[in-house]
């Protein structure tokens, strides 16, 4: 309803995002540990991962808003790979509950608007880790 456009919810529907230059910036919010893994390994079996691949194919920015309970565990290597991937940007991350969920990280969603502006300029918001 916000955009007045239909939701793209299949791999087939999202594949043209890049070639048709359907958006200037792709924001994945929230970006789960599963999505992080698939993006870092180039797996495109969901609408979200295909949208990202298609958008990156034409060298446009993708902004990730991570929210995962295993960011400092199994997902850490995927975050590391993606930090080193051209045109992928992160909303700054912080531990949301270091006592009860010591491996959990979540994006600071209050910084999303600033991160959008920076990603469109080809810049990563700093610091990445809060």
Residue ranges, per PLM feature:
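A cross-family phosphate/adenosyl-ligand binding-site feature
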Residues: 1-62, 67-130
């Amino acid at each position: 309803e916000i955009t007045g456009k239909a939701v793209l919810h299949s791999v087939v529907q999202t594949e043209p995002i890049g070639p048709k230059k359907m958006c200037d910036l792709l924001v994945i919010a929230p970006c789960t540990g599963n999505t992080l893994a698939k993006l870092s390994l180039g797996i495109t079996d969901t609408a979200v991962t295909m949208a990202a691949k298609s958008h990156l194919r034409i060298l446009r920015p993708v902004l990730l808003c991570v929210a995962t309970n295993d960011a400092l565990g199994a997902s850490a290597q995927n975050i590391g790979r993606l930090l080193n991937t051209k045109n992928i940007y992160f909303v700054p991350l912080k531990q949301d509950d270091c006592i009860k969920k010591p491996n959990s990280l979540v994006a600071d969603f209050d910084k999303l608007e600033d991160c959008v502006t920076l990603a469109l300029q080809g810049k990563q918001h700093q610091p990445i880790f809060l």
